[in-house]
């Protein structure tokens, strides 16, 4: 079966080699040091985050809308997290985007790069859950996940970072309580072949591994490395349009 990826517009390194020795993402020193750096950046950003959010909102050139998360730069985050992908909502006016509870708004710059996402709250006085994207280069970026109260203040909930590391890429984040999580992507010929994930709240549990199964140039399933107790495949996610249980 061929291994490729769907045309989802998400950035992958060009033709990397397969990693020779998988990282122990629970205990890897580099990942631990990155957690420390991210936490320090979270703390240092607390006094400037409100101005940063309002500055980014002022840079938005266009908005798109959906019923759930849809424009997520990190590869397959919805699928890996078991979350539904949003459906595009049309005929939404910008002035009404925060009045429709549960509506997701995605803000883009003039070049079409996503700068932020917001979920319209039930009560705007309780704040708007907002993601602010800050790019280091064409591939790596930080995400500030915040609660934004317009014209008042902003609270940082967590900070995440997507970056390349040797032949792999990593998406990891940490919150104000130092709880952290990490996704490590392995590639084959420039395309995702496997993802390892771990969250600190899992304690002694082993990191999870997921294999990406493709057919006819389309991702058809994300399958757990280990089988279920009954011997069945652990199908974490499947593309209902193309998935064939017998393949």
Name every feature range the model reports, one short phrase each.
Residues 2-247:
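Buried hydrophobic residues that stabilize the cores of well-folded domains
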């Amino acid at each position: 079966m061929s291994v490729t990826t769907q045309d989802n517009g998400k950035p992958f390194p060009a033709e990397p080699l397969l990693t020779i020795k998988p990282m122990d993402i629970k205990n890897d020193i580099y990942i631990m040091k990155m957690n420390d750096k991210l936490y320090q950046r979270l703390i240092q950003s607390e006094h400037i985050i409100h101005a940063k959010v309002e500055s980014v909102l002022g840079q938005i050139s266009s908005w798109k809308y959906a019923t759930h998360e849809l424009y997520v730069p990190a590869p397959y985050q919805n699928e890996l997290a078991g979350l539904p992908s949003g459906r595009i909502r049309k005929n939404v006016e910008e002035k009404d985007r925060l009045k429709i509870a549960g509506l997701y708004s995605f803000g883009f710059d003039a070049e079409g790069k996503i700068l932020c996402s917001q979920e319209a709250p039930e009560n705007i006085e309780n704040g708007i859950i907002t993601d602010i994207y800050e790019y280091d280069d064409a591939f790596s970026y930080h995400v500030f996940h915040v609660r934004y109260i317009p014209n008042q203040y902003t609270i940082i909930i967590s900070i995440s970072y997507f970056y390349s590391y040797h032949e792999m890429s990593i998406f990891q984040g940490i919150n104000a309580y130092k709880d952290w999580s990490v996704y490590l992507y392995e590639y084959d010929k420039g395309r995702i072949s496997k993802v390892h994930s771990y969250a600190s709240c899992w304690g002694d549990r082993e990191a999870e591994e997921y294999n990406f199964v493709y057919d006819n140039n389309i991702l058809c399933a994300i399958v757990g490395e280990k089988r279920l107790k009954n011997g069945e495949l652990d199908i974490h996610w499947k593309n209902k349009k193309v998935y064939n249980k017998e393949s």
